Amino acid sequence: MPTDLMDRYPSVDDLRRRARWRIPHFAWEYLDSGTGAEQARDRNIDALREITFVPRLLQGELNPSTEVELFGQTYAAPIGIAPVGLVGLTWPGGDVALAKAAAEKRIPYVLSTVGTEKPEVTGPAAQGMGWFQLYPPRDHDLRADLIRRAADSGFTTLVVTADVPTASRRERQRKAKVRVPPKIGPALIARAAVRPAWSIETLRAGLPRFKALEAYIDQATMAKTAGFVGANLGGTLSWEYLEAVRGMWDGPLVVKGLLNPDDAERAIDTGADAVVVSNHGGRQLDGSVASILSLIHI
Protein backbone atom coordinates (compact mmCIF):
# COMPACT_ATOMS: atom_id res chain seq x y z
CA MET A 1 0.00 0.00 0.00
CA PRO A 2 1.37 3.47 -0.87
CA THR A 3 2.67 5.44 2.11
CA ASP A 4 -0.02 8.12 1.85
CA LEU A 5 -2.76 5.49 2.06
CA MET A 6 -1.04 3.81 5.00
CA ASP A 7 -0.98 7.17 6.77
CA ARG A 8 -4.67 7.75 6.08
CA TYR A 9 -5.79 4.19 6.87
CA PRO A 10 -3.23 2.62 9.22
CA SER A 11 -5.66 0.00 10.56
CA VAL A 12 -8.49 -2.21 9.35
CA ASP A 13 -10.91 -0.19 11.47
CA ASP A 14 -9.87 2.93 9.55
CA LEU A 15 -10.63 1.15 6.28
CA ARG A 16 -14.01 0.00 7.60
CA ARG A 17 -14.98 3.55 8.54
CA ARG A 18 -13.93 4.81 5.12
CA ALA A 19 -15.83 2.05 3.33
CA ARG A 20 -18.98 2.81 5.29
CA TRP A 21 -18.91 6.39 4.01
CA ARG A 22 -17.94 5.44 0.45
CA ILE A 23 -20.61 2.86 -0.39
CA PRO A 24 -24.40 3.10 -0.01
CA HIS A 25 -26.10 2.05 3.20
CA PHE A 26 -27.67 -1.05 1.65
CA ALA A 27 -24.30 -2.24 0.32
CA TRP A 28 -22.67 -1.73 3.70
CA GLU A 29 -25.45 -3.62 5.48
CA TYR A 30 -25.04 -6.53 3.06
CA LEU A 31 -21.30 -6.67 3.66
CA ASP A 32 -21.21 -6.07 7.42
CA SER A 33 -24.27 -7.88 8.77
CA GLY A 34 -24.63 -11.25 10.44
CA THR A 35 -27.70 -13.40 10.90
CA GLY A 36 -30.40 -12.94 13.53
CA ALA A 37 -29.30 -10.84 16.50
CA GLU A 38 -25.69 -11.06 15.25
CA GLN A 39 -24.51 -12.82 18.39
CA ALA A 40 -22.32 -15.24 16.41
CA ARG A 41 -20.75 -12.35 14.51
CA ASP A 42 -20.02 -10.53 17.77
CA ARG A 43 -18.69 -13.71 19.39
CA ASN A 44 -16.20 -14.06 16.55
CA ILE A 45 -14.87 -10.55 17.17
CA ASP A 46 -14.84 -10.85 20.96
CA ALA A 47 -13.08 -14.23 20.91
CA LEU A 48 -10.38 -12.97 18.56
CA ARG A 49 -9.76 -10.02 20.85
CA GLU A 50 -9.09 -12.45 23.70
CA ILE A 51 -6.35 -14.31 21.80
CA THR A 52 -2.93 -13.31 23.12
CA PHE A 53 0.66 -14.34 22.45
CA VAL A 54 3.64 -15.11 24.65
CA PRO A 55 6.71 -14.00 22.64
CA ARG A 56 10.12 -15.66 22.73
CA LEU A 57 12.94 -13.11 22.82
CA LEU A 58 16.76 -12.97 22.62
CA GLN A 59 16.74 -15.04 19.45
CA GLY A 60 19.69 -13.37 17.76
CA GLU A 61 19.66 -11.67 14.36
CA LEU A 62 16.19 -10.96 13.03
CA ASN A 63 15.32 -12.45 9.66
CA PRO A 64 11.53 -12.70 9.71
CA SER A 65 9.47 -14.17 6.90
CA THR A 66 5.70 -14.44 6.59
CA GLU A 67 5.89 -16.89 3.68
CA VAL A 68 4.04 -20.18 3.99
CA GLU A 69 3.88 -23.26 1.78
CA LEU A 70 0.45 -24.76 1.21
CA PHE A 71 -0.45 -27.52 -1.23
CA GLY A 72 3.02 -27.30 -2.74
CA GLN A 73 2.74 -23.57 -3.47
CA THR A 74 4.47 -20.71 -1.66
CA TYR A 75 2.31 -17.79 -0.56
CA ALA A 76 3.62 -14.50 0.79
CA ALA A 77 1.57 -14.69 3.99
CA PRO A 78 -0.65 -17.16 5.86
CA ILE A 79 -3.77 -15.18 4.97
CA GLY A 80 -6.03 -14.97 1.94
CA ILE A 81 -9.16 -13.34 0.56
CA ALA A 82 -12.23 -15.36 1.55
CA PRO A 83 -15.13 -15.92 -0.86
CA VAL A 84 -17.83 -13.25 -0.79
CA GLY A 85 -21.01 -13.41 -2.83
CA LEU A 86 -22.35 -10.40 -4.72
CA VAL A 87 -19.02 -8.55 -4.49
CA GLY A 88 -20.11 -6.17 -7.24
CA LEU A 89 -22.72 -4.70 -4.90
CA THR A 90 -19.95 -3.53 -2.60
CA TRP A 91 -17.91 -2.13 -5.47
CA PRO A 92 -18.31 -2.64 -9.23
CA GLY A 93 -15.57 -4.86 -10.63
CA GLY A 94 -14.64 -5.96 -7.14
CA ASP A 95 -14.03 -9.61 -8.03
CA VAL A 96 -11.36 -8.79 -10.60
CA ALA A 97 -9.82 -6.08 -8.41
CA LEU A 98 -9.45 -8.56 -5.55
CA ALA A 99 -8.01 -11.22 -7.86
CA LYS A 100 -5.42 -8.78 -9.20
CA ALA A 101 -4.50 -7.64 -5.69
CA ALA A 102 -4.04 -11.26 -4.62
CA ALA A 103 -1.80 -11.91 -7.62
CA GLU A 104 0.29 -8.84 -6.82
CA LYS A 105 0.66 -9.75 -3.13
CA ARG A 106 0.92 -13.54 -3.73
CA ILE A 107 -1.89 -14.60 -1.42
CA PRO A 108 -4.90 -16.84 -2.18
CA TYR A 109 -8.06 -15.32 -3.60
CA VAL A 110 -11.27 -17.38 -3.44
CA LEU A 111 -13.98 -16.65 -6.02
CA SER A 112 -17.51 -17.44 -4.88
CA THR A 113 -19.94 -19.39 -7.04
CA VAL A 114 -22.26 -16.41 -6.52
CA GLY A 115 -19.61 -13.80 -7.18
CA THR A 116 -20.29 -11.18 -9.81
CA GLU A 117 -17.71 -12.18 -12.41
CA LYS A 118 -17.16 -15.35 -14.42
CA PRO A 119 -14.34 -17.71 -13.46
CA GLU A 120 -13.05 -17.36 -17.02
CA VAL A 121 -12.33 -13.69 -16.27
CA THR A 122 -11.28 -13.86 -12.63
CA GLY A 123 -9.08 -16.95 -12.87
CA PRO A 124 -6.53 -15.46 -15.28
CA ALA A 125 -6.51 -12.20 -13.29
CA ALA A 126 -5.46 -14.14 -10.17
CA GLN A 127 -2.35 -15.51 -11.96
CA GLY A 128 -2.24 -18.83 -10.13
CA MET A 129 -3.42 -17.45 -6.78
CA GLY A 130 -7.08 -18.27 -7.47
CA TRP A 131 -9.16 -20.80 -5.57
CA PHE A 132 -12.79 -21.53 -6.52
CA GLN A 133 -15.55 -21.82 -3.92
CA LEU A 134 -18.35 -24.23 -4.80
CA TYR A 135 -21.88 -24.00 -3.44
CA PRO A 136 -22.90 -27.63 -4.05
CA PRO A 137 -25.27 -27.81 -7.05
CA ARG A 138 -28.05 -30.37 -6.88
CA ASP A 139 -27.66 -31.29 -10.55
CA HIS A 140 -24.73 -33.59 -11.40
CA ASP A 141 -24.06 -32.01 -14.79
CA LEU A 142 -24.11 -28.47 -13.37
CA ARG A 143 -21.69 -29.53 -10.64
CA ALA A 144 -19.35 -31.16 -13.14
CA ASP A 145 -19.40 -28.16 -15.47
CA LEU A 146 -18.68 -25.60 -12.74
CA ILE A 147 -15.75 -27.72 -11.56
CA ARG A 148 -14.48 -28.06 -15.13
CA ARG A 149 -14.73 -24.32 -15.74
CA ALA A 150 -12.82 -23.60 -12.54
CA ALA A 151 -10.00 -25.93 -13.57
CA ASP A 152 -9.89 -24.59 -17.13
CA SER A 153 -9.75 -21.00 -15.80
CA GLY A 154 -6.60 -21.63 -13.77
CA PHE A 155 -8.03 -22.06 -10.28
CA THR A 156 -5.71 -24.33 -8.34
CA THR A 157 -7.84 -25.27 -5.32
CA LEU A 158 -11.52 -26.16 -4.91
CA VAL A 159 -13.30 -24.97 -1.75
CA VAL A 160 -16.61 -26.72 -1.02
CA THR A 161 -18.84 -24.76 1.35
CA ALA A 162 -20.58 -27.02 3.86
CA ASP A 163 -22.38 -24.62 6.20
CA VAL A 164 -25.17 -23.24 3.99
CA PRO A 165 -27.81 -25.99 3.84
CA THR A 166 -30.39 -23.23 3.42
CA ALA A 167 -30.53 -19.44 3.28
CA SER A 168 -30.26 -17.64 6.61
CA ARG A 169 -32.33 -14.79 8.00
CA ARG A 170 -30.36 -11.56 7.95
CA GLU A 171 -32.47 -8.95 9.67
CA ARG A 172 -30.22 -5.94 9.01
CA GLN A 173 -30.33 -6.71 5.31
CA ARG A 174 -34.12 -6.88 5.36
CA LYS A 175 -34.31 -3.50 7.09
CA ALA A 176 -31.90 -2.03 4.54
CA LYS A 177 -34.06 -3.40 1.68
CA VAL A 178 -31.27 -5.54 0.25
CA ARG A 179 -32.95 -7.43 -2.59
CA VAL A 180 -31.76 -9.56 -5.50
CA PRO A 181 -32.57 -8.14 -7.96
CA PRO A 182 -32.69 -4.70 -6.34
CA LYS A 183 -36.04 -2.95 -6.16
CA ILE A 184 -35.22 0.43 -7.63
CA GLY A 185 -37.31 3.14 -5.99
CA PRO A 186 -36.94 6.56 -4.38
CA ALA A 187 -35.25 5.25 -1.22
CA LEU A 188 -32.61 3.25 -3.10
CA ILE A 189 -31.95 6.11 -5.52
CA ALA A 190 -31.58 8.58 -2.64
CA ARG A 191 -29.09 6.36 -0.83
CA ALA A 192 -27.08 5.80 -4.00
CA ALA A 193 -27.10 9.50 -4.88
CA VAL A 194 -25.19 10.45 -1.73
CA ARG A 195 -22.43 8.00 -2.71
CA PRO A 196 -21.51 9.48 -6.12
CA ALA A 197 -18.29 7.51 -6.72
CA TRP A 198 -20.10 4.19 -6.20
CA SER A 199 -23.04 5.34 -8.32
CA ILE A 200 -20.86 6.46 -11.23
CA GLU A 201 -18.92 3.18 -11.23
CA THR A 202 -22.17 1.20 -11.07
CA LEU A 203 -23.62 3.14 -14.00
CA ARG A 204 -20.49 2.28 -15.99
CA ALA A 205 -20.42 -1.39 -15.03
CA GLY A 206 -24.13 -2.11 -14.73
CA LEU A 207 -25.95 -3.67 -11.81
CA PRO A 208 -24.18 -6.70 -10.29
CA ARG A 209 -25.05 -10.11 -11.74
CA PHE A 210 -24.20 -13.71 -10.87
CA LYS A 211 -22.22 -14.06 -14.08
CA ALA A 212 -20.82 -17.54 -13.42
CA LEU A 213 -24.34 -18.97 -13.48
CA GLU A 214 -25.77 -17.06 -16.44
CA ALA A 215 -24.38 -19.68 -18.83
CA TYR A 216 -27.04 -22.11 -17.58
CA ILE A 217 -30.04 -19.80 -17.99
CA ASP A 218 -31.82 -18.81 -21.20
CA GLN A 219 -32.06 -15.03 -21.59
CA ALA A 220 -30.63 -14.56 -18.11
CA THR A 221 -31.84 -11.70 -15.95
CA MET A 222 -30.91 -11.06 -12.33
CA ALA A 223 -34.36 -12.24 -11.24
CA LYS A 224 -34.02 -15.48 -13.20
CA THR A 225 -30.50 -16.06 -11.92
CA ALA A 226 -31.52 -15.45 -8.30
CA GLY A 227 -34.31 -17.98 -8.73
CA PHE A 228 -31.84 -20.41 -10.26
CA VAL A 229 -29.55 -20.06 -7.23
CA GLY A 230 -32.40 -20.87 -4.84
CA ALA A 231 -33.56 -23.84 -6.88
CA ASN A 232 -30.20 -25.40 -7.72
CA LEU A 233 -27.55 -24.62 -5.10
CA GLY A 234 -27.26 -26.04 -1.59
CA GLY A 235 -29.30 -28.39 0.53
CA THR A 236 -27.68 -31.56 -0.82
CA LEU A 237 -24.20 -31.79 0.65
CA SER A 238 -23.38 -35.13 2.24
CA TRP A 239 -20.26 -37.20 2.76
CA GLU A 240 -21.18 -39.17 -0.35
CA TYR A 241 -21.52 -35.92 -2.30
CA LEU A 242 -18.11 -34.77 -1.07
CA GLU A 243 -16.58 -38.07 -2.13
CA ALA A 244 -18.05 -37.59 -5.61
CA VAL A 245 -16.60 -34.07 -5.81
CA ARG A 246 -13.22 -35.47 -4.80
CA GLY A 247 -13.41 -37.74 -7.83
CA MET A 248 -14.13 -34.80 -10.14
CA TRP A 249 -11.31 -32.51 -8.96
CA ASP A 250 -7.63 -33.32 -9.40
CA GLY A 251 -6.19 -30.50 -7.30
CA PRO A 252 -6.30 -29.65 -3.59
CA LEU A 253 -9.78 -29.91 -2.06
CA VAL A 254 -10.85 -27.83 0.95
CA VAL A 255 -14.08 -28.11 2.94
CA LYS A 256 -15.21 -24.75 4.33
CA GLY A 257 -17.48 -24.14 7.29
CA LEU A 258 -16.68 -26.93 9.75
CA LEU A 259 -16.72 -26.37 13.51
CA ASN A 260 -16.90 -29.91 14.90
CA PRO A 261 -13.65 -31.89 15.27
CA ASP A 262 -15.40 -35.10 14.20
CA ASP A 263 -16.59 -33.45 10.98
CA ALA A 264 -13.10 -32.14 10.29
CA GLU A 265 -11.58 -35.58 10.75
CA ARG A 266 -14.18 -37.20 8.52
CA ALA A 267 -13.64 -34.58 5.82
CA ILE A 268 -9.96 -35.52 5.67
CA ASP A 269 -10.86 -39.22 5.64
CA THR A 270 -13.24 -38.54 2.73
CA GLY A 271 -10.45 -37.04 0.66
CA ALA A 272 -10.26 -33.37 1.59
CA ASP A 273 -6.77 -31.91 1.86
CA ALA A 274 -7.75 -29.25 4.40
CA VAL A 275 -10.69 -27.63 6.15
CA VAL A 276 -11.62 -24.02 6.81
CA VAL A 277 -12.79 -23.68 10.41
CA SER A 278 -15.56 -21.13 10.04
CA ASN A 279 -19.09 -20.19 11.09
CA HIS A 280 -19.55 -18.21 7.87
CA GLY A 281 -18.68 -14.95 9.58
CA GLY A 282 -21.69 -15.33 11.86
CA ARG A 283 -23.98 -15.09 8.83
CA GLN A 284 -25.65 -18.52 9.01
CA LEU A 285 -26.33 -19.81 12.56
CA ASP A 286 -26.56 -17.19 15.28
CA GLY A 287 -26.09 -19.76 18.02
CA SER A 288 -22.80 -21.11 16.67
CA VAL A 289 -19.53 -21.10 18.56
CA ALA A 290 -16.86 -18.56 17.62
CA SER A 291 -14.70 -19.96 14.84
CA ILE A 292 -11.40 -19.34 16.62
CA LEU A 293 -12.58 -21.36 19.63
CA SER A 294 -13.39 -24.34 17.41
CA LEU A 295 -9.97 -24.04 15.78
CA ILE A 296 -8.36 -24.75 19.15
CA HIS A 297 -10.06 -28.16 19.30
CA ILE A 298 -9.70 -29.05 15.62
Language-model features: where?
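Glycine-rich beta-to-alpha transition loops that act as phosphate-gripper elements at the mouths
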Residues: 113-116, 137, 236, 254-261
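Conserved, mostly hydrophobic/aromatic
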Residues: 24, 81, 102, 160, ...
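Glycine-enriched alpha-helix->loop->beta-strand junction motifs that scaffold or abut catalytic
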Residues: 106-108, 125-130, 154-156, 248-251, ...
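Glycine-rich active-site/cofactor-binding loop and its immediate structural neighborhood
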Residues: 76-114
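An N-cap/entry alpha-helix motif that binds or orients negatively charged groups
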Residues: 1-72, 178-237
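Glycine-rich phosphate-binding active-site loops on the catalytic face of alpha/beta enzymes
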Residues: 163-164, 274-288
